[in-house]
Amino acid sequence: VVLVPAVIYTALGMLRLAPAWRAPTKLTQCGCGDGGFTMWYLGWMQYALGHGHNPLFTDWLFYPTGVNVMWNVSLPLPGFLLSPLTAEWGVIFSYNVLVVVAFAGTATSAYLVLRRWAPWPPAAFAGGLLYGFSPYMIGQGLGHAHMLLLLLIPVMLLLLDELLVRQQIRFWITGPLLAVVAVAQLLTAEELLASAALIGGIGAGVLIVLFPGRVRTRLPHALAGLALAGVIALALAAVPLKNQLTGPQRLTGTVSSPDLYRADLLSWVVPSRLVHFAPPAALDISSRLGGNVAENGSYLGIPLLVIAVGVVVLLWRSRPVVRWAGFTLLAVMVLASGRSLKVGGHETGVPLPFRVVEHLPLLESLVSIRLASYAVLLCALLLAVGMDGLRGWIRTWQAEPAPAEGTGTRRAWRPTAGVSAGALAGALAVVALLPLLPTSYRYNGIRDADIPPWFTSVAVQARVPDGSVLVTLPPASPQTSAPMVWQSAAHYRFKVPFGYSLHPGDDGRGQFGPYPSTFGGVMARVRRGPQPRLNAESIREMRANLAAWQVRTVVLRDQAHTH
């Protein structure tokens, strides 16, 4: 049952990186910025495990102080699972595979879970297609692989539904399963675990308001399962959490402003560059709504929102899940809008509930617009249930009574009933999904990672002592992480005093770039241009920086100079 949808989703995922498959070990989405960051950590996990290093801390970046890996979106679990591919074909290949798995796995996971509420496979398929290839996913696919891996979120929804609502399985089975999934999410993308806990709490609150009597009778089972899940999750996650909270190079304070990227009221209905059908007038409006293109994926479209509302209204009594999904969707959309309402790029000053949420433990650095992924999942649920309900209603309506036999009455179906019901339900999916058709894969910017041949040649072993410190010119930075990919291509033979990762600054708060230094300042000015003029004092300080970092080798693209 799942094979055909999974194959289709995988083909669509591969299409997102279509040009890369000509040379998947060299071609990728730039290999710089966030993409290069992710590639480095995929390679680090394989290298650390293979060489007996602590995978949760590294001084291969920002030497000698290093980086607490758990404070970064380092994908420990995916890195571990992809280690065989990384060892054989390198980080670029593993990254390309990871992106495809993220798209296909997210869609397939949603398909399987949605069949609980929408048993008709085409309805669940449409919901999976929406969740796995929404504008949110297309945007995050431009470089944020950790936010692209949503395949565990529907599984958590399924387990919470079992634990809080259905309760057909013993809590001592559901609780441990939820714990394992939560820890897997922690080791994939910690921000998603935090946001899932937030939305799970809101969803539970909606349940209590809508169905207080049912909740009351199910409360002991639910609390027992949640408590067991919490205990087991803490035990399983003890080592990584201890490293994050008490280990070296831990951070204090918030990592980023929650309001940095947030949904505009119009962003839900105005298409952006992430979708194919976006007229120039809409693009002009979208460009003024704030954020960058990767963090502008809240677009759902008017047709989908109208269908979602219609499903809630029409199936209000017959399918209670739509009531829950409708109110939870509204709450999620409000939270994704940040601390105050913004309309058309203009601040209204109207306060929103996120002002309270951002002060909750573990949620201080939550990026509000990323909650749009939960809005997509809820819309996928409503679309799937709506299609399933429409098909059932049409089949019932087209049924005609047959002559009674004995004491009973049977109903005979018209031969065309199933076909017409499926066609109309399919048309509903087309109306909802066509406006969300992703932009061409060409927009992904697939290109050669352009790794200088020197880093993959025997010259590295000949000129660079294993574990020594090396500086590339240009050095790695938040503006260009390409030198980190060069380091991974050289199999982490050397450490670097620069990089692009979250680590504590002088005040303990997070920063992504290197500590201030004369050498780093000069290199930054060289990158920006024009060439700086250096006096004797600057040269002396730069040499002192290199000596303090114990630098043995300086590499200018394809040339190595050892000193």
Model-derived features: where do they sit?
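Membrane-interface coil-to-helix junctions
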Residues: 12-106, 135-151, 262, 266-288, ...
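Periplasmic/ER-lumenal interhelical loops and adjacent helix-loop junctions
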Residues: 29-48, 235-312, 361-372
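Membrane-helix boundary/interfacial segments in multi-pass membrane proteins
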Residues: 31, 140-147, 283-298, 331-381, ...
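Start-transfer (signal-anchor) and selected internal transmembrane alpha helices
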Residues: 1-18, 222-231, 313, 319-328, ...
